[in-house]
Swiss-Prot record:
It comes from Thermoanaerobacter pseudethanolicus (strain ATCC 33223 / 39E) (Clostridium thermohydrosulfuricum). Its main location: cytoplasm. It holds the Pfam family tRNA_anti_2. Signal peptide: none annotated. This is Exodeoxyribonuclease 7 large subunit.
Length: 401
């Protein structure tokens, strides 16, 4: 009896059903090395191989978006999914639902491979690093909007210099979408003209968790930024590709705030030193001119003949006029400098906050009260406003929980 001839689609459909109904093939974990990696609009296509065999794989976007690291050729991974037949060309392949690195070594391999590539391209060269401004007016912080990182940065910034504006740009800092959000934030900030420096920050974590900061797209966005970027990712011992590309690496997010935000007390000391130096220079210049003038008067007295006396008299008159004009010019110039410095110093005065609607609370000894621990019920206090002052009695003291 002659066997019935089956059409190609029939035998292919039969094989597909056998595989789809196989209890083992419906849920398998396969270990191997990635090769022929291709990213497509529909998903990720690659081949999984070992020393003897190879297996075609596909991970569609619904699962690919859950990856928390970037796949690369040569990376050792473990793929979980199902084996089935792709009917169009009659080949079987692994439909991946999740991919994990085969140990931390795979991620280190990808890290070192990208590091070597970018280093050869010159992205780490020190002569291409942009200087961090010493007196920034506005700082952008690209990080998660919740957690200790942004709280620490804001607290330290306000303590060091409350006049510096902090712009928080919220992004994901781990997961498959984090790299794209970070790049988008950097592009948006580079379209603004009011940002002086960018802090890119997140707290510590495993290599997988901080992996977005090791992705090539993030590295290239940092390198392309016209605004200086400070990388502050993880703990002091953590290093990422972002650290190498950034214009400056801070060991922690808190350290980044200490580095970038100038201390207002340093401003005040600088202004005081400039004022002292200005007064010293003015005094020295006036004394020098006075000595020169006294010397000419003495020469006139010692050379008494009429002609010499007349010549010296004219010389003294000219010098006197010149001295007066020069002293007047110096005085006006130094006075203008002093007024500018005084205005800067006044702008930094703690009393300046009164003009912005804040108040200052003093005790009986005229000392500033900065904590509820400094007062108790029925204490007499004084409240300073921008346009006057008031006395009050404390009714109740309650500390924050």
């Amino acid at each position: 009896m002659q066997l019935k001839a089956l059409e190609v689609r029939e035998i292919t459909d039969y094989i597909k059903k056998m595989m789809d109904n196989d209890i083992i093939l419906r849920n398998v974990r396969v270990k191997g090395e990635i090769s022929n990696l291709k990213y497509h609009s529909t998903g990720i296509y690659f081949t999984l191989k070992d020393e003897i065999a190879s297996l075609k794989c596909v991970m569609f976007n619904e699962y690919g978006k859950l990856l928390n690291f970037t796949l690369q050729d040569g990376m050792s991974v473990i793929v979980t999914g199902r084996i089935s037949v792709y009917e169009r060309n009659g080949t079987y392949q692994l439909y991946a639902q999740s991919i994990q690195s085969d140990g931390i070594g795979a991620l280190y391999f990808a890290f070192n491979k990208l590091k070597e590539k970018l280093q050869k391209e010159g992205l780490f060269d020190s002569d291409k690093k942009k200087p961090i401004p010493k007196h920034p007016k506005k700082i952008a912080v690209v990080t998660s909007p919740t957690g200790a990182v942004i709280r620490d940065i804001i607290t330290i910034s306000r303590r060091r210099n409350p006049t510096v504006d902090i712009l928080v740009v919220p992004v994901l800092v781990q997961g498959s979408s984090a790299a794209d959000e970070i790049c988008n934030a950097l592009r948006i900030l580079n379209k603004r003209e009011d940002i002086d420096v960018i802090i890119l920050a997140r707290g510590g974590g495993s290599l997988e968790e901080i992996w977005p900061f090791n992705e090539e797209k993030v590295a290239r966005c940092i390198y392309a930024s016209r605004i200086p970027v400070v990388s502050a990712v993880g703990h002091e011992t953590d290093f990422t590709i972002s650290d190498f590309v950034a214009d400056l690496r801070a060991p922690t997010p808190s350290a980044a705030a200490e580095i970038v935000v100038p201390d207002i007390k340093v401003y005040q000391r600088e202004l005081f030193l400039l004022k002292t130096k200005l007064l010293t220079l003015m005094t020295a210049e006036l004394n020098r001119k006075k000595k020169e003038f006294e010397g000419l008067k003495r020469a006139l007295y010692l050379n008494s003949p009429t002609k010499k006396s007349e010549i010296l008299r004219h010389k003294v008159e000219n010098l006197t006029a010149s001295l007066y004009n020069e002293m007047l010019s110096i005085y006006q110039h130094k006075r203008n400098d002093f007024l500018i410095l005084a205005e800067k110093l006044n702008s930094l005065s703690p009393l300046k906050v009164l003009t912005r609607g804040y108040t200052i609370v003093l005790d009986k000894q005229e000392k500033v009260i900065s904590s509820v621990k400094d007062i108790k019920p029925y204490d007499e206090i004084k409240i300073l406003f921008k346009d006057g002052k008031a006395k009050a009695i404390v009714q109740e003291v309650k500390e924050n929980e």
